[in-house]
């Protein structure tokens, strides 16, 4: 193991043990740092302490020339800045060359979401007479009812569900927990799945799956990739013209709440956002909702007799 690899390994351990970051987040950090190490090797830079501000500018220029988006570059810079902050704390370097690097200004993207008519169609495609269909229906209902992330859904255990109060304890990023309520549709879908479909799926698996709510066809805990595949297949059945991604039901949850008058702070808490700015991206509304509001409230929207 080279000295560079040793320092990267120490940083990854720090993210796992002290910061308690998710595997997905750590993977992103690792990829960014390893890519930068390859850049250092090409440039003939032996150690992290030798990297200068000018080197970081060359690195960024190459990233732009590769056609990377500003969002991707911003994530890489953020990861490297955190890495050097760790090295400084451990007194392994004397300065952070990424501290003066300005993060690229990102385009504000409006999250994609489903209209109510599209949701209704999506909720009718699962064959709820089968264990997998019952599971899929419970996944759809719970994702839309709570706005939780797919990774949070996959980590749910039976002890996290309170069906008497219709609430779920969600284990979010950075070991943060939050209670989120859900409605009658999600309640009914969960009851059907837990009392029938899940028992049949569990019988095919091993003891390690006992605690997890959502299981695959072999009785093992369902993964993020598994949920992504399920959502894609369900959307194909509902409408071949639409593409659904794992976060779309979360976007839809937030958008529909705000469109119906929920306050931003409450939605922030339900989503588990640490910053309000992360929630504000959902303040877009549909054209129909905008038109309805305009026609209802603008004094000169139409002539009154």
UniProtKB/Swiss-Prot annotation:
InterPro entries: CB (IPR044068), DNA_brk_join_enz (IPR011010), Integrase-like_cat_sf (IPR013762), Integrase_catalytic (IPR002104), Integrase_recombinase_N (IPR010998), Integrase_SAM-like_N (IPR004107), Recomb_XerC (IPR011931), Tyrosine_recombinase_XerC/XerD (IPR023009). Its main location: cytoplasm. Pfam families: Phage_int_SAM_1, Phage_integrase. Keywords: Cell cycle, Cell division, Chromosome partition, Cytoplasm, DNA integration, DNA recombination, DNA-binding. Residues 109-295 form the Tyr recombinase domain. The keyword Transmembrane does not apply. The keyword Cell division applies. One of its GO terms (biological process) is chromosome segregation. The active site is at 149, 173, 247, 250, 273, 282 (o-(3'-phospho-dna)-tyrosine intermediate). Residues 2-88 form the Core-binding (CB) domain. GO terms for molecular function: DNA binding; tyrosine-based site-specific recombinase activity. One of its GO terms (cellular component) is cytoplasm. It is found in: Cytoplasm. Site-specific tyrosine recombinase, which acts by catalyzing the cutting and rejoining of the recombining DNA molecules. The XerC-XerD complex is essential to convert dimers of the bacterial chromosome into monomers to permit their segregation at cell division. It also contributes to the segregational stability of plasmids. Forms a cyclic heterotetrameric complex composed of two molecules of XerC and two molecules of XerD. Belongs to the 'phage' integrase family. XerC subfamily. NCBIfam families: PRK00283.1 (NF001399), recomb_XerA_Arch (NF040815), recomb_XerC (TIGR02224). This is Tyrosine recombinase XerC. It comes from Bacillus pumilus (strain SAFR-032).
């Amino acid at each position: 193991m080279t000295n560079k690899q040793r320092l990267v390994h120490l940083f990854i351990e720090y993210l796992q043990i002290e910061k308690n970051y998710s595997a997905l987040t750590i993977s992103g950090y690792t990829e960014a740092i390893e890519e930068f190490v390859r850049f250092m090797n090409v440039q003939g830079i032996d150690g992290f302490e030798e990297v200068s501000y000018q080197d970081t500018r060359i690195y960024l220029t190459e990233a732009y020339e590769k056609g990377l988006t500003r969002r991707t570059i911003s994530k890489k810079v953020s990861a490297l800045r955190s890495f050097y902050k760790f090295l400084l704390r451990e007194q392994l370097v004397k300065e952070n060359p990424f501290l003066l690097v300005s993060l690229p200004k990102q385009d504000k993207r409006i999250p994609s979401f489903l209209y109510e008519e599209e949701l209704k169609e999506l909720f009718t495609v699962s064959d709820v007479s089968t264990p997998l269909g019952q599971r899929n229906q419970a996944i759809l209902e719970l994702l839309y009812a709570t706005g939780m992330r797919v990774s949070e859904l996959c980590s749910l255990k039976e002890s996290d569900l309170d069906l008497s109060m219709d609430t779920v304890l969600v284990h979010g990023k950075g070991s943060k927990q939050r209670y989120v309520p859900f409605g009658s549709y999600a309640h009914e879908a969960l009851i059907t799945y837990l009392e029938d479909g899940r028992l049949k799926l569990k019988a095919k698996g091993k003891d390690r799956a006992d605690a997890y709510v959502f299981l695959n066809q072999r009785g093992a805990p369902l993964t993020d990739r598994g949920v992504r595949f399920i959502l894609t297949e369900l959307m194909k059945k509902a409408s071949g013209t639409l593409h659904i991604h794992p976060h779309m039901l979360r976007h839809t949850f937030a958008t529909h709440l705000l469109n119906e008058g929920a306050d931003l702070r409450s939605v922030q808490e339900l989503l588990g956002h640490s910053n309000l700015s992360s929630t504000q991206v959902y303040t877009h509304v549909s054209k129909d909702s905008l038109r309805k509001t305009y026609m209802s409230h603008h004094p000169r929207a139409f002539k009154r007799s």
